[in-house]
């Protein structure tokens, strides 16, 4: 879940009228409404109640993520120490790297407990920065898409919630101000780009879409949510399998729980 506990200065395409400080009442109401179904929530740790909210969500079994923030290095470190285990789409919607104002990115990559998300579409994050991210945090990068409803659809005009967006060349921007408003990326394409365009090993590319995100939620071992562990082709793991054409890195067949779906 992204929002509503985000920094106004890094809101991206989020409606500023909906942004809130995560006071205990809001946290408790959200946890009650989710009824155990909330897995991850992005929080700007510099908000007045940001660190306390991270602790509260973590104590409830939710994985807090640092993102959509303008946090300095020390505040981001406090967020991770309080229980945040993920950085939401690194480089996007946060203050960037600076040698005198390091910000949240070094805090995430220095902490071995933190899984670092990346949107590998060549647009949200340019290829040199994707490679830099993998160098920063080897075996801790998780591919995410930030995809919205126009994914796998033609270019044109769409709605993102109540917001008008335009999709041009597969890139999504708000019609009002041109701000990036999600993506049309699929995980298949993210892995494909990593291998064919960035030169990553198949192991590193596939791991970023499977085992690493599974580890972030504790799904790489027996757990009450998925029951069988996820993320590997190994005895005892869920029989969820993709068959990929190695020449073009496109998915050809899909099995879920050992049943052929495609």
Regions found by a protein language model. Name each.
Residues 2-37:
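Divalent-metal coordination cores built from histidine and acidic residues
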Residues 25-155:
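Active-site core of metal-dependent hydrolases
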Residues 257-258:
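Glycine-centered positions in the ABC transporter ATPase nucleotide-binding domain
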Residues 20-24, 44-47, 51, 98-102, ...:
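Electropositive phosphate-/nucleotide-binding environments in soluble metabolic enzymes
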Residues 248-254:
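Short, Lys/Arg- and Gly-enriched loop/turn segments at beta-strand edges
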Residues 103-116, 134-147, 151-244:
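His/Asp/Glu-enriched, well-ordered alpha-helical/loop segment
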């Amino acid at each position: 879940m992204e929002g509503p506990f985000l920094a106004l200065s890094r809101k991206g395409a989020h409606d500023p009228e909906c942004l809130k400080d995560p006071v205990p009442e809001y946290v408790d109401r959200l946890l009650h409404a989710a009824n155990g179904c909330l897995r991850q929530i992005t929080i700007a740790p510099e908000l007045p109640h940001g660190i306390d909210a991270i602790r509260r969500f973590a104590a409830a079994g939710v994985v807090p993520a640092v993102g959509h923030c303008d946090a300095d290095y020390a505040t981001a470190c406090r967020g991770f120490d309080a229980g945040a285990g993920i950085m939401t789409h690194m480089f996007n919607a946060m203050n960037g790297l600076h040698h005198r104002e390091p910000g949240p990115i070094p805090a995430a990559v220095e902490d071995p407990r933190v899984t670092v998300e990346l949107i590998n579409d060549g647009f949200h994050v340019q290829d040199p920065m994707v490679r830099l991210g993998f160098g920063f945090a080897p075996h801790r990068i998780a591919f995410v898409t930030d995809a919205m409803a126009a994914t796998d659809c033609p270019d044109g005009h769409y709605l993102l919630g109540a917001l008008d967006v335009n999709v041009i060349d597969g890139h999504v921007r708000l019609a009002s101000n041109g701000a990036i408003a999600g993506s049309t990326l699929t995980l298949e394409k993210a892995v494909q780009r990593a291998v064919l365009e960035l030169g990553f090993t198949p192991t590193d590319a596939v791991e970023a879409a499977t085992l690493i995100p599974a580890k972030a939620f504790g799904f790489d071992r027996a757990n009450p949510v998925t029951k069988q562990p996820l993320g590997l082709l190994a005895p005892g793991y869920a029989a969820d399998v993709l068959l990929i054409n190695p020449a073009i890195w496109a998915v050809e067949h899909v099995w879920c729980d050992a049943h052929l779906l495609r």
